[in-house]
Regions:
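Alpha-helical transmembrane segments of multipass membrane proteins
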Residues: 1-3, 20-25, 100
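Hydrophobic core segments of transmembrane alpha-helices in multi-pass, intramembrane catalytic enzymes
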Residues: 12-23, 35, 39, 64-70, ...
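Interfacial segments of multi-pass membrane proteins
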Residues: 14-34, 127-128, 212-235, 298-304, ...
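Hydrophobic, glycine- and aromatic-enriched re-entrant/interface helices and adjoining loop segments
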Residues: 38, 43-238, 263-265
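A juxtamembrane structural motif centered on a specific transmembrane helix
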Residues: 71-77, 87-102, 283-330
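Loop-to-helix entry and N-terminal half of a specific, functionally important transmembrane alpha helix
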Residues: 254-295
Length: 330
């Protein structure tokens, strides 16, 4: 129904209306056709006759009102079928909350009607997915989650990039995706880091013999970009050895977590492994130019007392939890 409202041409809206006939033939109630007809009417009245005012308050409120009507009908119909089920009550409350939140957001922070439509229809889409076709075909749940997540990401990424991220964040992402070449500005650190790692070759230039690092071409080489020092001085094999040591540490932490009997101890062990893994992945990734530069330390490697203390305390607490398990088993 929301797709009908989002169309810019009447013909496209009628095509989506035709899909409702297929849903009706597959077993949905006749109300689905009524909702489709109502969506067509609202499309013509709100979109076509107020196309000049879509960007301002009047057009936005018209679209929000039209979508709210569609949403309320879709909420009331399934709720009336199962008024006493707990899941129906929860869904009713969440749906009304989403609609009210969308109206409030549109009042204080006007957005394009596409984002309003996606936000107000998200809860209903999930509800229909779980209570309709997916109950008959449980294996499609993962596919539905991926599809819904992809659609939300497509519509939300542009708004987040333009309205949430700061200008310097946007430049870093553009440099990462090769959308903007700035070797002397935002891309300088990554460019020099890749030169240092590439010049190291297989065996490296030797301990303290790196040219890019020792001549200070690579900024922050003691903290955020310390991995490029390893790559330049010790080459591919030295870098691989460091990554293998990290892998052994993560496997050891996971093994400790697997043998814990209490849920909290297991969750804590997995959390420690996740923290170390993401720090390692992001730090090494940004040094190699495959991750945006966000200034994250390499665990137990980067210079800095606070990060060293933080990671050490995480491991100390994990070892103490494991020791308490051994004490209780005696």
């Amino acid at each position: 129904f929301v797709l009908i409202l989002l169309q810019k041409e009447t013909g496209s809206a009628l095509v989506f209306m035709a899909f409702l006939l297929m849903f009706y033939r597959e077993g949905m109630k006749g109300i689905v056709l009524l909702l489709g007809a109502l969506a067509i009417v609202l499309f013509i009245v709100v979109i076509r006759f107020s196309i000049e005012t879509i960007g301002n308050e009047q057009g936005s409120w018209g679209v929000v009102g039209a979508i709210a009507i569609i949403q309320l009908i879709q909420i009331i119909v399934p709720f009336s079928s199962h008024p006493h089920k707990k899941e129906s009550l929860i869904f009713l409350g969440l749906s009304v909350l989403v609609i009210v939140a969308s109206v409030i957001i549109n009042k204080w922070y006007p957005v394009d009607y596409n984002y309003v439509a996606i936000g107000t229809s998200l809860v209903t889409a999930i509800y229909w997915a779980f209570t309709g076709i997916l109950r008959r075909y449980p294996k499609l749940i993962a596919v539905a989650f991926i599809s819904i997540g992809s659609l939300v990401f497509i519509y939300a990424s542009d708004m987040i990039f333009n309205h949430v991220l700061e200008p310097h964040h946007q430049i870093r992402i553009k440099v990462l995706l090769n959308m903007e070449d700035d070797p002397t500005g935002a891309g300088y650190n990554v460019n020099q880091s890749k030169i240092a790692i590439g010049s190291g070759g297989l065996w490296g230039k030797g301990f303290l013999n790196g040219t890019q690092t020792k001549l200070k071409y690579v900024p922050e080489q003691d903290t955020d970009f310390i991995f490029c020092t390893v790559g330049e001085e010790h080459g591919f094999w030295g870098s691989a050895l460091v990554l293998i040591i990290y892998w052994l540490l993560l496997m050891r932490i996971m093994k400790i977590g697997e043998r814990q009997k209490e849920s909290f101890h297991r969750v804590y062990a997995y959390s420690v492994a996740s923290i170390l893994f993401f720090h390692l992945m992001i730090n090494v990734g940004m040094v190699l130019g495959i991750m945006p530069v966000i200034g994250i330390p390499l665990p137990f490697f980067s210079y800095g007392g606070s990060s060293l203390w933080g990671f050490t305390l995480l491991l100390f607490i994990l070892l103490r939890l494991d020791a308490s398990r051994l004490e209780r088993s005696r």
